[in-house]
Every structure is written in structure tokens, then in C-alpha cells.
Amino acid sequence: VGTVGRVTYFNYLITATVDSHVSIVRIDKQKADSLFIFYNLRWREKEIESTAEGSTGQVELSREKLKEMKILLPPLPEQKAIAEVLSSIDNKIDLLHRQNKTLEEMAMTLFRQWFIEPTKDGLPEGWEEVSLGEFIKEILGGDWGKEKPEGEYKIKVNCIRGTDISDLQDSLPKKTPIRFIKQSKFKSIEPKDGDIILEISGGTETQSTGRSIYISSFNRQLFEYPIIFSNFCRLLRPKENYYTYYLYLYLKYLYINDEFFSLENGTSGIKNLDYKTLLYDLKYPMPKNTEIYLSFYENVSILFEKIDKNKFQIQTLEKLR
């Protein structure tokens, strides 16, 4: 239901059951390697999904049709060898994901140590209350373009939406749609290295708007085409490139601490972030000395560069797999 065709491999020493919307595929180990079958089925998720039956929104997998699916089955030793190679790639991908999570946590820890913890007992000497907008050169609106080439809409791009930002933060841009926009519009809104894309519309009752992602020469390579962003996002262009990670981490810090819920307006279905109040009206304690921001950038940039390189390696391994 909702996820027809998705496959996972259960390899845990725990007692567990599944509900009626999940099918267990139990392999005859004399004929096939279970891990090999798992990879085969995962590769064919779309095919499995096409066997689903029922009304729109309440479709279920046809177990009978699943049984009828044909599979090219090499000799058992060859199956095991193939599964071992694929499993090794998966383990490497998982390791890189966990490494990135650790690196991101390290960057956030440094941010807290430099800019949050010093203010717990009041405003330190050499600090002042200023808005995040003091660090921003300009804010640009996005464009959704067209689904197909039409008239002047000829430039093929990947368009980042708010929902894609979560993928970009955690892993890779897997579902970023392809759109077509005008050349003039592309030139005016194409993100540059050091820019930040901020989600301003979306959210739910339990998840606020306000997710963000920085743009770099590394994560730009993760996309098939040049990138733009939708009109449900805003591009923040820092006055200096060394403000990028400071702004990104500050926005993320506010987001994970649920500060953006109080800045939302709109209907119950679609929430809009009052980003102008966030960036220009609210004041936060910040150091006056710009050398502090430059030093912070030098400390965390190596972490983010490693994160981006890991993402590129993950993408390469996934294509290989």
C-alpha cells in the first residue's frame, strides 16, 4: 500500500512478523541464493509494481503474478559470487552514508561551540544582535519552467524543489525533475557556488518548512543537467563565500530546533515560511569580527568538501551496482 514493489532483505536475529500488506519471499536454498534473489527483485521494482491490483490509492501486490515472474538463474556458486560483489558495494555505500552523517554532526557541533554556546550567559564582549540578512547580498525567486520544450523554453535543467532538499542533505538528488526554462531566466537564477537554496513553501503539521542546502562545485556534479530551483524556494546569495556554511548551519540549527513553525502562515494544507521576517526582522547574537567567520569557514569547509566527495562516490557506486 503506497510502496508496492519495494524490496528489502531481512537478515536480523530477532523475532518479527509482517502485516497483511507485505509479502515474504522465502527462497529454496538448494536452488537459489536469497541475497542474489533480493538484488534481482530490487532491480525489478518497477516491474513488480506493475503487477499491483486494486483501485488507485489502494493497490496491492498480486502474489500469483509475482510467482509467475521469470528469472535468469545462473549456477548457485555464480549467484553467490554476484551477490557478494553487490553486497560489498552496498556496504561501502552504507559506510559512506554513515561517514557523512558523522561529518555533518561534527560541523554542527563546531557551529554550536563557536556561535551558540558562547551566548548562553548573555551577549559576549565583541558580539551584537543582528539579522541573518546582514550576511546576504541578494535573494532570488525560482522558476518552475515547462515540462517539455516550448517556444523560448529550451534550456534543459534539473529543478530543485523543497522535497528534493531532504534528499540532497541526506544523500543524492534521486527525484529532482527535469524542466525547460528560458535562457534569460536561467542566466538570472542559476545557483552559484556558495549560494543557499531555502524551502519557503510546503511542510506538514509535524514538519515545518525551511529546509536548506548549500551549492558547491562538488554537489553540482551530482546532477545530470544544470540546476535551477522552483518558485517554492528562494536562493540566498551570501555577501562573501565564507559566510555560506555559517548561514547554512544557522538555518539548519533553527530548523532542527523547530523555530520555523512560529514563522509559518497559510492554509492547513500548504505552509508558507515568512522568510523575510526570518532573515531581516529577527535578531541573533553574532560576533562583530569578520575574521571569526573566515576562520570558522576554514575549519568546516574541509568537512563539507569530504561530504560532497563522498556523495559523488556514492553516486558512482550506485551506478556501478
Describe every region a protein language model picked out.
Residues R6, V18-D19, G133-P149, T163-T206, ...:
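Sequence-specific dsDNA recognition surfaces
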Residues F10-N11, I215-S216:
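Short beta-strand-to-turn element immediately C-terminal to the catalytic PLP-Schiff-base lysine
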Residues E84, P191, G210, I215, ...:
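Glycosyltransferase-associated regions of secretory-pathway enzymes
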Residues Y12-T15, S23-P77, S131-I139, Y153, ...:
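Basic, amphipathic alpha-helical recognition segments used for DNA target recognition
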Residues E68-W144, K288-R321:
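Non-catalytic DNA-recognition/assembly elements of restriction-modification systems
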Residues V7, T209, F223-E224:
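Compact nucleic-acid interaction/catalytic patches
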